[in-house]
């Protein structure tokens, strides 16, 4: 049987495998906080992977039952991943977990198996909350103690901005996988067809306008979060700013690539390290 410390280290390794740069940043938090972050990240990861990788809805249901058992403290044996759930259960004894956000994530991941285009931006924004705003909310009790309503709102906004940024980065790739995340109403408003844009040698002005419309929504969220860093614990602020700056950098890279629908734009390791070094200097000073 694994020890509690081994369970936390298992969660830590999952975070390092999937998100090395952010894992490194979170590792600067005090021990109890960073261990809770590892556990939350690992739970969210297996929720995503249950459908995205394994197409196993029953495993997702097992995760859901395990989370309920942890919330109500009804068992110490789990149906899904015992190591992750044991670490998460321990973290939940130290921090005021927002279990509803985790249930919302699980519900969104399950519903996403039967994806349909969103009629309006309300559907798109609800989706962004469900897959990423929820994660922002889950992290707030660790990053802002005690968690305030404002901190929860900005955590939600940051998560939604990160997801919207992912969507703006992956328009072409998502289309080839049978998905269009821009809402029908907004596509009609801008008179844009993603199928037609894929076939063009040069993207239309209208496509660039709709892309920038959504980028502005993400940017507004980033601005809101960065203007209210004081709601977070002092040791958490650099991490929040790092996430916002790195992901905002993705929008810049898409523009530099002329909004290409063929290749995925990304922030280079060198640029990430530069952002990290600059922030470390800023917060050290």
Swiss-Prot record:
**What's the cofactor?**
Mg(2+)
Amino acids binding Mg(2+) 1:
48, 52
Q: In which pathway does it act?
A: Carotenoid biosynthesis; staphyloxanthin biosynthesis; staphyloxanthin from farnesyl diphosphate: step 1/5
Q: Which UniProt keywords apply?
A: Carotenoid biosynthesis, Magnesium, Metal-binding, Transferase, Virulence
Q: Could you give the cofactor binding note from the entry? A: Binds 2 Mg(2+) ions per subunit.
Question: Where along the chain is (2E,6E)-farnesyl diphosphate 2 bound?
Answer: 45, 163
The record's listing under Pfam families reads: SQS_PSY
Q: Which CDD domains match?
A: Trans_IPPS_HH
Look at the named UniProt entry and state the broad enzyme category this protein falls under.
transferase
Task: Name one process (GO BP) from the record.
Answer: carotenoid biosynthetic process
Drop me one GO molecular function for this one. geranylgeranyl diphosphate synthase activity
This entry's Enzyme Commission designation comes to 2.5.1.96
Q: Which domain of life is it from?
A: Bacteria
Question: What is the residue range of the signal peptide feature?
Answer: none
Q: Where does Mg(2+) 2 bind?
A: 166, 170
Which residues are listed for (2E,6E)-farnesyl diphosphate 1 binding in this entry? 18-21, 41, 45, 169, 247
UniProt function note: Involved in the biosynthesis of the yellow-orange carotenoid staphyloxanthin, which plays a role in the virulence via its protective function against oxidative stress. Catalyzes the head-to-head condensation of two molecules of farnesyl diphosphate (FPP) into the colorless C(30) carotenoid 4,4'-diapophytoene (dehydrosqualene).
Instruction: Tell me its family.
Output: Belongs to the phytoene/squalene synthase family. CrtM subfamily.
Q: Quote the PANTHER family the UniProt record gives.
A: BIFUNCTIONAL LYCOPENE CYCLASE/PHYTOENE SYNTHASE (PTHR31480)
The protein's name: 4,4'-diapophytoene synthase
Gene name of this polypeptide: crtM
């Amino acid at each position: 049987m694994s020890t509690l410390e081994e369970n936390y280290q298992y969660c830590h390794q999952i975070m390092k495998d999937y998100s090395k740069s952010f894992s490194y940043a979170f590792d600067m938090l005090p021990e109890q906080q960073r261990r809770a972050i590892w556990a939350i990240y690992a739970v969210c990861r297996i929720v995503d992977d249950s459908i995205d990788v394994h197409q196993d809805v029953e495993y997702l249901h097992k995760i859901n039952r395990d989370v309920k058992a942890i919330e109500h403290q009804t068992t110490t044996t789990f149906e899904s991943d015992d190591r992750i759930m044991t670490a998460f259960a321990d973290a939940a004894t130290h921090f005021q977990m927002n279990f509803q956000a985790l249930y919302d994530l699980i519900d969104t991941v399950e519903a996403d198996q039967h994806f349909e285009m969103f009629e309006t931006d309300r559907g798109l924004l609800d989706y962004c909350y469900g897959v990423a705003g929820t994660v922002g909310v889950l992290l707030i009790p660790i990053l802002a103690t005690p968690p305030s309503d404002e901190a929860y709102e900005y955590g939600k906004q940051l998560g939604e901005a990160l997801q919207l940024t992912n969507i703006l980065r992956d328009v072409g790739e998502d289309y080839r996988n049978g998905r269009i995340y821009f809402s029908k109403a907004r596509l009609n408003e801008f008179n844009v067809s993603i199928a037609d844009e894929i076939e063009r040698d040069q993207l239309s002005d209208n496509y660039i306008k709709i892309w920038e419309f959504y980028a502005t929504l993400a940017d507004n969220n980033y601005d809101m979060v960065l203007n209210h860093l004081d709601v977070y614990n002092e040791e958490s602020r650099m991490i929040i700013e790092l996430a916002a700056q790195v992901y905002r950098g993705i929008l810049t890279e898409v523009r530099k690539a002329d909004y290409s629908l063929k290749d995925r734009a990304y922030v280079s390791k060198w640029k990430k390290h530069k952002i990290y070094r600059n922030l470390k200097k800023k917060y050290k000073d």
